[in-house]
């Protein structure tokens, strides 16, 4: 079975009840419809993948090189393009150019990995960015309460090691959360109810793929 995936939009979080009347927090993801615009094969490209297109956009806003890709695939231009890597060469036989993918590719109770862009927090200090404890609030501490402390020795090593955790820009990173449970698939509305939190803001683009660390349930 080829690894499945779909592009979608995060709509927000809510809560539903399971069969035991327990509250389940879920993220609602508008999944698809996606269209397959290109198929990568090991013989031609060196790897196996399918290119997925998603979202509405005015054709006037798409440049000519990208428009040519859509024309070759025989589909209307879309807002987003992404590649879904496949496990092996045989997996590409399950896809064809122009094929439409919807939320129904997943089933209730399956596990997925969700990739999105985390919310940007701007410039943040070490306490917020890395969870530092800070320094004393009293007993002679003056204007150092949220400072990081020492970042290295003076004479040895006489430099700051690469990767030292310091203040800086926080968020707006590509984040993947693995092994999230698909609580319910609403095929009529084209949405997935995924248990737990999903990276990114409401309205952000996400890629939902079958979990790589768990087999098909």
Curated annotation (Swiss-Prot):
Keyword Iron-sulfur attributed: no
Keywords of the record: Ribonucleoprotein, Ribosomal protein, RNA-binding, rRNA-binding
GO cellular component, one term: cytosolic large ribosomal subunit
Molecular functions (GO terms): rRNA binding; structural constituent of ribosome
Pfam family, one: Ribosomal_L3
Subunit note: Part of the 50S ribosomal subunit. Forms a cluster with proteins L14 and L19.
Function of the molecule: One of the primary rRNA binding proteins, it binds directly near the 3'-end of the 23S rRNA, where it nucleates assembly of the 50S subunit.
Protein name per the record: Large ribosomal subunit protein uL3
Organism expressing this protein natively: Mycobacterium marinum (strain ATCC BAA-535 / M)
């Amino acid at each position: 079975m080829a690894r499945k995936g779909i592009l979608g939009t995060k709509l927000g979080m809510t809560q539903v009840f399971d069969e035991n009347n327990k509250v389940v927090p879920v993220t609602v993801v508008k999944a698809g419809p996606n269209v397959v615009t290109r198929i990568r094969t090991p013989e031609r490209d060196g790897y196996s993948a399918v290119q997925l297109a998603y979202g509405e956009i005015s054709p006037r806003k798409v440049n000519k090189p990208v428009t040519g890709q859509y024309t070759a695939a025989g589909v209307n231009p879309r807002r987003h393009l992404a590649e879904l890597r496949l496990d092996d060469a045989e997996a590409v036989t399950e896809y064809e150019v122009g094929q439409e993918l919807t939320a129904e590719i997943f089933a209730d109770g399956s596990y997925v990995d969700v990739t999105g862009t985390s919310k940007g927090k701007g410039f943040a200090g070490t306490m917020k960015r890395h969870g530092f404890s800070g320094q004393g609030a009293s007993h002679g501490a003056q204007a150092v309460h949220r400072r990081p402390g020492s970042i290295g020795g003076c004479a040895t090593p006489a430099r700051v090691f690469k990767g030292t955790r310091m203040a800086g820009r926080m968020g707006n990173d590509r984040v993947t959360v693995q092994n999230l449970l698909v609580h319910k698939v609403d095929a009529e509305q084209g949405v997935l109810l995924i248990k737990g939190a999903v990276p990114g803001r409401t309205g952000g683009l996400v890629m939902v793929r079958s979990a790589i660390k768990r087999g098909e349930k």
